[in-house]
Design a protein with these regions (language model features):
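Conserved glycine-rich Rossmann-like NAD(P)H-binding loop of the short-chain dehydrogenase/reductase
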Residues: 38-54
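C-terminal substrate-recognition "lid" of short-chain dehydrogenase/reductases
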Residues: 128-131, 187, 221-250, 255
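Alpha-helical segment proximal to the catalytic Tyr-Lys
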Residues: 136, 180-184, 241
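Substrate-binding pocket helix/loop in short-chain dehydrogenase/reductase
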Residues: 107-108, 112-120, 213
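Residue(s) in the substrate-gating loop at a strand-loop-helix junction
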Residues: 151
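Active-site helix of classical SDR
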Residues: 131, 167, 175
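The beta1-alpha1 cofactor-binding region of Rossmann-like NAD(H)/NADP(H)-dependent oxidoreductases
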Residues: 49-50, 70-81, 113, 226-227
Length: 256
């Protein structure tokens, strides 16, 4: 009984302010829901204002505190504006979840410049821009949690995903470096590396390919968005106060 109470308190985010990018759907929405349910005030960021509005409305319908901020994560000026607006509204920033990301899959010899650039810009540059903007208010508050979305593809590589794998490998390197830079200010920086998760992105692979994928996963199934959200909650919470520079795989044993 006591152990359960301690665990609940450790992941209680009441009074904490969080930014989640790519929050309008998929993993980002699941993460926003999890943080809200744990007591955080969540600033939902996404390039799609329409989908963002639907997500924020759904969060508020549960009695949670959420605001929507339309933003292209590759636009440095807009990123800075969003962070400033969040800090002004809620008095600080405690948690940043860099989840926004895209794929433009094709074999490397067929990959066009714009396919490479778009993935690197959103997945890696967007992560950097939000870290840079969020670091200042976190340093001022002498506390922070930064969680970046990596991927097992950034650890092992994946045919047809040279751009995506490179961007996620870059996120891992960025995570470890910034973890060292900000540790002295009590700011932890970690990454979550999902494997195959049941989202719109994986559904597009088709049933036949997904059945083959499941055979490669020791647990024999795809992960759920909630599995990733739980990992993010842990890293955002006091339960992970001594964890930094770490990459937490959520892949059902795929990379074991």
């Amino acid at each position: 009984m006591t152990e359960g109470l301690v665990n609940t308190l450790a992941t209680n985010l009441s009074g904490r302010v969080a930014i989640v990018t790519g929050a309008a759907r998929g993993l980002g929405r699941a993460i926003a829901e999890k943080l809200c349910a744990s007591g955080a005030q969540v600033a939902c960021v996404d390039v799609s204002a329409e989908l963002l509005g639907e997500t924020v409305a759904a969060l508020r319908a549960n009695g949670w505190t959420a605001e929507g901020y339309p933003c292209d994560v590759t636009n440095s000026q807009r990123v800075n504006e969003v962070v400033d607006e969040v800090v002004k509204k809620w008095g600080g920033l405690d948690i940043l979840v860099n989840n926004a990301g895209i794929t433009r899959d094709t074999m490397v010899m067929r990959m066009k410049d714009d396919q490479w650039d778009a993935v690197l810009d959103i997945n890696l540059k967007g992560t950097f821009l939000f870290i840079r903007a969020a670091a200042r208010p976190m340093m001022k508050g002498r506390r922070g949690r930064i969680i970046n979305m990596a991927s097992v593809s950034g650890m092992t590589g994946n045919p047809g995903q040279a751009n995506y794998s490179a961007s996620k490998a870059g996120v891992i390197g960025l995570t470890r470096t910034v973890a060292r830079e900000l540790a002295g200010r009590n700011i932890t920086v970690n990454a979550v590396a999902p494997g195959f998760i049941a989202t719109e992105m994986t559904a597009a692979l088709g049933e036949q390919i997904l059945e083959e994928v499941k055979k490669r996963i020791p647990l024999g199934r795809l992960g759920e968005p909630g599995d990733v959200a739980n990992a993010v909650l842990f890293l955002a919470s006091d339960a992970a106060s001594f964890v930094t520079g770490h990459v937490l795989t959520v892949d059902g044993g795929l990379t074991a």
